[in-house]
Structure formats: C-alpha cells, structure tokens
C-alpha cells in the first residue's frame, strides 16, 4: 500500500512519484482532494498555489506484524533520507542516499531524491523495487532499492553516482 506525503512544513521541495505498471512509468499526479485539510481555513486549491502543491515523499505499508494490518515498512521523505522497519521494530536512525561535505567548514550539501519510480509488485510478491533519481549541485545519481520486508527487513541498494566537482 502506497501513502504519499504532502509538501509542507519542513518538506517544501516536491518530488515526482511514478508507478511502474507493465514496464511503463505512470506519473502519480498531485491532486489536492487526496488529502484531508481538516478545519484549516485554507482550501486545497489555495495550498497548491501557495506551496506549488505536490508530494514531498512516500511510505509503503505491508503486513509485517499481522495479516490484518498494513504496517509502515519504508519511508522516503526529505532530501535523500530513507528508513525501513523490520517485524516488531520501531524507527531509529534514517539512512541517506548521499552525504556531501558533512561536518566541513564550508557547510554540508544535501543532495535530494527528485523522482521515484515504484514498481508495482505482483500479488503475494516478497519484494518491491523502488528506483530514484538523486540531484545536487555537486552530484547526480541513480538508485535501485530492493526492499524485502519481513522479520529482518532487508534493503539492497545499488547506486550509480556521477560527480560534477570534487567533494569531501
């Protein structure tokens, strides 16, 4: 089960999210009516115009702990941050697709995933593939995440990075 995060708060950069169905990428177009804005005195249309609308990231749900409930199993939200859960676990640290100039005197650069392609799994599939495009002033990258949820969730990450200039 896919759940999209709305742009807003700390997460102001929209990302493109696509679903791969029968080997074709299908964009998941932003629709304000997908979200419940509650009692806020702002219409979804106003929010779209103010923030540019869009999705900030996504999470996937899977029956980790029970066959009757879909638990959050992985989340991609903000810059190149992602994290996954195993059965009975709680979130701890997040991982990053790439850290550039971390703890340097000139300041850290935060590369960001700008587009995702989520391969729609077949019924009863044991894994899901997620592809991502990473971009920053210093680097570009292409990622393949193979997520295998379970007692010990495993995520195989393959990345191809291309540097535009030297980094620390």
Regions found by a protein language model. Name each.
Residues 6, 47-49, 87, 105-107, ...:
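Generic structural signal for short, flexible, solvent-exposed coil/loop and linker residues
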Residues 18, 59-61, 131-133, 146, ...:
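Residue-level recognition of well-ordered beta-strand positions that form the cores
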Residues 144-168:
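Acidic (Asp/Glu-rich), glycine- and aromatic
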Residues 1-104:
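Solvent-exposed N-terminal domain segments of exported/luminal and surface proteins
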Residues 34, 64-66, 134-136, 151, ...:
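Short loop/turn segments at secondary-structure transitions that flank enzyme active sites
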Residues 92-150:
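Extended, loop-rich substrate-binding clefts of extracytoplasmic carbohydrate-active enzymes
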Residues 11-13, 54-56, 124-128, 139-141, ...:
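Residues at beta-strand starts and edge strands
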Residues 28, 139-141, 167-168:
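Short helix/loop capping segments that flank catalytic or ligand/cofactor-binding pockets
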């Amino acid at each position: 089960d896919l759940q999209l995060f709305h742009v807003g708060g700390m997460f102001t950069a929209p990302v493109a999210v696509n679903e791969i169905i029968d080997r074709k990428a299908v964009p998941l177009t932003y629709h304000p009516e997908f979200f419940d804005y509650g009692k806020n005195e702002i219409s979804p249309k106003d929010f779209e115009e103010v923030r540019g609308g869009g999705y900030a990231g996504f999470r996937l749900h899977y029956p980790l702990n029970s066959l009757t409930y879909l638990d959050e199993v992985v989340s991609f939200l903000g810059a190149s941050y992602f994290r996954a859960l195993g059965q009975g676990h709680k979130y701890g640290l997040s991982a990053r697709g790439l850290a550039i100039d971390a703890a340097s005197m000139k300041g850290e650069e935060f590369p960001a995933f700008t587009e995702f392609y989520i391969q729609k799994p077949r019924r009863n599939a044991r894994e899901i593939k997620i592809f991502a495009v990473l971009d920053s002033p210093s680097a570009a990258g292409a990622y393949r995440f193979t997520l295998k949820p379970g007692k010990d969730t495993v995520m195989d990450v393959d990345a191809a990075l291309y540097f535009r200039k030297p980094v620390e």
